[in-house]
């Protein structure tokens, strides 16, 4: 199982938000490419980049940093935030992204995944599903949909999504542990790999995810606040 450090960018800084709230940050650091390098030096085999400005404003803002990290990190990079069109996704793949993460737009219009998979291949498409109280939420967690994660997950898998990034919003950024059940349901019901995110605070949390068969776990706040040592975490889940 992969342990994938998050490098979330806002206003050209590396940040970690509490419950996705742009006004509530518990980490704010300069020079995202340097941070990315630090995680790779500690053993990260993949990086998770998020353009938070893009996610909140609907357009990509941190391309310069993203391109620098792709060029200099030496590991595959998955990228999300502000990817609202096929053109955006193709652009990032051409720049060297291993996977592009599509969120809201895929849930609202699953057909876009079919079209995109024909252009760039399923293996490059990761769909981001965020769930709150058992239902998928979109538009920066502001809007609730009628779908459960498994319902929309099956539709997106059929359309050509290559993997799912699943965030249980109820535990995201709060640093109080994980609820494994919603992720387990996805792993049990879908064929494509599931990458989990949200609420990991201990190596024990990571081992629980490993046990249910996720492909990887994105870690953010816990490594920035030194609750988890990345090297130890990678070693523990090998």
UniProtKB/Swiss-Prot annotation:
Entry's Gene Ontology cellular component terms: cytoplasm
Its UniProt entry gives the catalysed reaction(s) as: 1-(5-phospho-beta-D-ribosyl)-5-[(5-phospho-beta-D-ribosylamino)methylideneamino]imidazole-4-carboxamide = 5-[(5-phospho-1-deoxy-D-ribulos-1-ylimino)methylamino]-1-(5-phospho-beta-D-ribosyl)imidazole-4-carboxamide
Pathway terms, separated by semicolons: Amino-acid biosynthesis; L-histidine biosynthesis; L-histidine from 5-phospho-alpha-D-ribose 1-diphosphate: step 4/9
Please name the top-level EC class of this enzyme: isomerase
Q: What are the positions of the active site? A: 8 (proton acceptor), 130 (proton donor)
Task: Please provide the record's keywords in A-Z order.
Answer: Amino-acid biosynthesis, Cytoplasm, Histidine biosynthesis, Isomerase
What InterPro entries is this protein classified in? Aldolase_TIM, His_biosynth, HisA_bact_arch, Isoase_HisA-like, Isoase_HisA-like_bact, RibuloseP-bd_barrel
A single GO molecular function term of this UniProt record:
1-(5-phosphoribosyl)-5-[(5-phosphoribosylamino)methylideneamino]imidazole-4-carboxamide isomerase activity
Look up keyword Isomerase and say if it applies: yes
Instruction: Provide the protein's localization.
Output: Cytoplasm
Question: Is Oxidoreductase set as a keyword in this record?
Answer: no
- EC numbers: 5.3.1.16
Q: List the disulfide bonds.
A: none
Major localization class: cytoplasm
Check the record and name the SUPFAM superfamilies matching this protein: Ribulose-phoshate binding barrel (SSF51366)
Gene Ontology BP terms = L-histidine biosynthetic process; L-tryptophan biosynthetic process
Stated family: Belongs to the HisA/HisF family.
Protein name, entry field: 1-(5-phosphoribosyl)-5-[(5-phosphoribosylamino)methylideneamino] imidazole-4-carboxamide isomerase
Q: Which gene encodes it?
A: hisA
